[in-house]
């Protein structure tokens, strides 16, 4: 039987895939705005990974017979989170290539707040 319903891991895969496509598209088009949007998606994947990690640790604690399967899912989640991080790295370099500056996360968030208000 499945260790848990796989909802978050497929969602992480979808977002990570979209991030890679988005960062590569931003690179090809030299699109700073598209590259900047990648950061927001990275936070979403990070949160999903933390949720999956905590949930699977609980499962392993409650049922040691599931440790091996849960460990494989934790690694899958971790690797998807790293893919999202790599897409973010590409996006940061796109911003640098186009502007000569990579804003800090705080600068980027301030800009997003200013644009939404």
Give the location of each predicted region:
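Cytosolic, long alpha-helical scaffolding segments
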Residues: 1-117
């Amino acid at each position: 039987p499945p260790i848990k319903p796989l909802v978050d891991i497929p969602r992480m895969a979808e977002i990570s895939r979209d991030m890679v496509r988005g960062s590569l598209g931003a690179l090809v088009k030299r699109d700073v705005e598209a590259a900047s949007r990648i950061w927001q998606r990275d936070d979403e994947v990070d949160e999903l990974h933390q949720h999956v990690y905590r949930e699977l640790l609980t499962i392993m604690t409650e049922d040691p017979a599931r440790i091996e399967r849960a460990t494989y899912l934790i690694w899958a989640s971790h690797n998807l989170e790293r893919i999202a991080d790599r897409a973010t790295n590409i996006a940061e370099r796109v911003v640098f290539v186009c502007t000569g500056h990579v804003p800090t996360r705080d600068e980027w968030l301030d800009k997003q707040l200013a644009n939404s208000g």
